[in-house]
Structures are given as structure tokens and as C-alpha cells.
């Protein structure tokens, strides 16, 4: 496993592997933990954005072999070395393997977003320092119907701000249905 800062050379390497095509936000990360075979990237976990959002993508034939946990652990260790206070991740709760992996590494679910009928994400956090506890408390505001309404309005009408905060490019942020977010709300 390797740790790499994002630069144009590595961005091209990600594109050649096809990983950034499947997950555009990888190209926006500040740094990566990645694995390669024959100079070809087969899996990468990246970190970026104001909320230190972690993203992970592994080529299909490499899934189910523990690579995700290895990469995510590498990312967590590097974040600690760099003095990060916390990391967050957006995880589809229906992805059981990802759910188990993130939970086993210490991520805790703060709230769930039902963007639409088909798109659901749990927002998880792992805290390393006091500032991380403060951020967690702020994010817990969204674990209520009123908080979800506020989040829905923010996402819907402030889409241009979100890429900097949560790493995703604007086109990768799901279009929220505020009504769906409220009616399907689940307290965590």
C-alpha cells in the first residue's frame, strides 16, 4: 500500500485504471492510500473536503479480499499523522460489506439521508481529537426531522458550496427530494 498526494500524474493513473470514472470524487481528494498491481491502480481510498470525507473505490475483481479495509486503515493512520481531528464517510447502508468495514474501523453513524426513493446514505464519523467531538455534535443536528429539513434546503439551494465541503463534484451530489428526506426520516 502507498500514500500519495493528489497531482496531475496520479490523477491520470486513476483515470487509466477506471477508478475515477466510477467515482469522480477521487480526483478531488487531497491524498490517497492506494494499491497497485503491475503499475496499475486496483484500489484507492482518498480524503478531502472541509469535512474530511473519505471515499473508496476498488476494481470489481479485487473486491472481497480485504483491500478496502487495508486502504481505509491506511487512510485513517495517515490522517492521524497529519493531525486530523476526524474523518467522515457517506455510506449506503444497503452495502453490507462497506457498512461492516467502516463500523469495524470505528466509524459511528450520525444520521441517515434519504435523498430520493433509491438513494440513501448514512453519514458516519470517526473522531480522533476534541475538535472532532465538536464537529460530531454539530452534525448530530441533522439527526432530527427539523435538521433534515434544514439539510435538504441547504443541499438543494447551495449545491455549488457542497463540493468544497464534502469532496463530491456538483454533478455527483444527489438531487434531494426534501419531501422524501422528511417523510423517510429515520432517527439514528
Which stretches of residues belong to each language-model region?
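Conserved beta-hairpin
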Residues: 29-43
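Conserved catalytic-core motifs of GNAT/GCN5-like acyltransferases
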Residues: 90, 108-124
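Conserved acetyl-CoA-binding loop-helix of GNAT-fold acetyltransferases
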Residues: 58, 64-77, 104
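A short helix-loop-beta-strand connector motif used in the catalytic cores of GNAT acetyltransferases and
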Residues: 23-33, 52
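Conserved GNAT acetyl-CoA-binding A-motif
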Residues: 79-93
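Conserved active-site alpha-helix within GNAT-family acetyltransferase domains
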Residues: 93-111
Amino acid at each position: 500500500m502507498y500514500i500519495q498526494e493528489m497531482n496531475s500524474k496520479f490523477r491520470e493513473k486513476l483515470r487509466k485504471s477506471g477508478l475515477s470514472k466510477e467515482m469522480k470524487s477521487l480526483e478531488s481528494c487531497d491524498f490517497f492510500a492506494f494499491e497497485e498491481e503491475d503499475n496499475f491502480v486496483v484500489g484507492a481510498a482518498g480524503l478531502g473536503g472541509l469535512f474530511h470525507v473519505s471515499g473508496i473505490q476498488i476494481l470489481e475483481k479485487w473486491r472481497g479480499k480485504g483491500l478496502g479495509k487495508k486502504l481505509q486503515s491506511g487512510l485513517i493512520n495517515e490522517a492521524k499523522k497529519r493531525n486530523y481531528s476526524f474523518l467522515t464517510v457517506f455510506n449506503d447502508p444497503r452495502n453490507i460489506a462497506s457498512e461492516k468495514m467502516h463500523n469495524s474501523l470505528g466509524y459511528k453513524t450520525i444520521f441517515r439521508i434519504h435523498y430520493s426513493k433509491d438513494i440513501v446514505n448514512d453519514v458516519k464519523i470517526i473522531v480522533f481529537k476534541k475538535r472532532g467531538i465538536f464537529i460530531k455534535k454539530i452534525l448530530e443536528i441533522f439527526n432530527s426531522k427539523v435538521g433534515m429539513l434544514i439539510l435538504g434546503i441547504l443541499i438543494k439551494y447551495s449545491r455549488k458550496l457542497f463540493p468544497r465541503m464534502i469532496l463530491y463534484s456538483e454533478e455527483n451530489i444527489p438531487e434531494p427530494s426534501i419531501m422524501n428526506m422528511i417523510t423517510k426520516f429515520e432517527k439514528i
